[in-house]
Amino acid sequence: MAALVLLRAGLARPRGVPTALLRGTLLRHSAVLTAAADRSAPARQSHGGAPQGHGSSKAASLHWTSERAVSALLLGLLPAAYLYPGPAVDYSLAAALTLHGHWGLGQVITDYVHGDTPIKVANTGLYVLSAITFTGLCYFNYYDVGICKAVAMLWSI
């Protein structure tokens, strides 16, 4: 579809095809393309979240960058947990795993839950689940052996 839009705008053309040959074809099919674009526009608008603007674009970019940073942090924390187990790595893992899971499940909610009330209920449930997860991992780190030692004990079985 993007190639057709570029062809119609005159920004691209297939190799070896003169522009004069494309003009007649594009003029005949422009009404069909416009009608198809109009039919698909409501579907695109209803699937997205916030309207596209500079503010939402910047926030989305920052959120995406934060997700990648947490994923990269997890890649570094896993070997660190094996090589240097301790409370600092345990609590860092608790925070990073909870945040990574929260953002991942948030994307599942965004993709598969529709309607105002179900979205609010699902997001509230997600925040409760994330808070319980983080609290449980911190409790486990403080009162028990910690995440690193627990994984090492599982590996020794």
Swiss-Prot record:
Signal peptide: none
Pathways involved: Carbohydrate metabolism; tricarboxylic acid cycle
One of the GO BP terms on file: tricarboxylic acid cycle
Its membrane topology: Multi-pass membrane protein
Binding site for heme b: H100
Gene Ontology cellular component list: mitochondrial inner membrane; respiratory chain complex II (succinate dehydrogenase)
One MF annotation (Gene Ontology) recorded for this entry: heme binding
Targeting presequence: 1-45
Residues in compartment: Mitochondrial intermembrane: 84-88, 141-157
UniProt keywords, alphabetically: Electron transport, Heme, Iron, Membrane, Metal-binding, Mitochondrion, Mitochondrion inner membrane, Transit peptide, Transmembrane, Transmembrane helix, Transport, Tricarboxylic acid cycle
UniProt: a ubiquinone binding residues: Y112
Subcellular localization: Mitochondrion inner membrane
TM spans (from-to): 62-83, 89-109, 119-140
Residue ranges that the UniProt entry lists as topological domain Mitochondrial matrix: 46-61, 110-118
Primary location class: mitochondrion
Record Pfam families: CybS (PF05328)
The protein's assembly and partners: Component of complex II composed of four subunits: the flavoprotein (FP) SDHA, iron-sulfur protein (IP) SDHB, and a cytochrome b560 composed of SDHC and SDHD.
Family from the record: Belongs to the CybS family.
Function: Membrane-anchoring subunit of succinate dehydrogenase (SDH) that is involved in complex II of the mitochondrial electron transport chain and is responsible for transferring electrons from succinate to ubiquinone (coenzyme Q). SDH also oxidizes malate to the non-canonical enol form of oxaloacetate, enol-oxaloacetate. Enol-oxaloacetate, which is a potent inhibitor of the succinate dehydrogenase activity, is further isomerized into keto-oxaloacetate.
Name used for this protein in its record: Succinate dehydrogenase [ubiquinone] cytochrome b small subunit, mitochondrial
Gene this chain is encoded by: SDHD
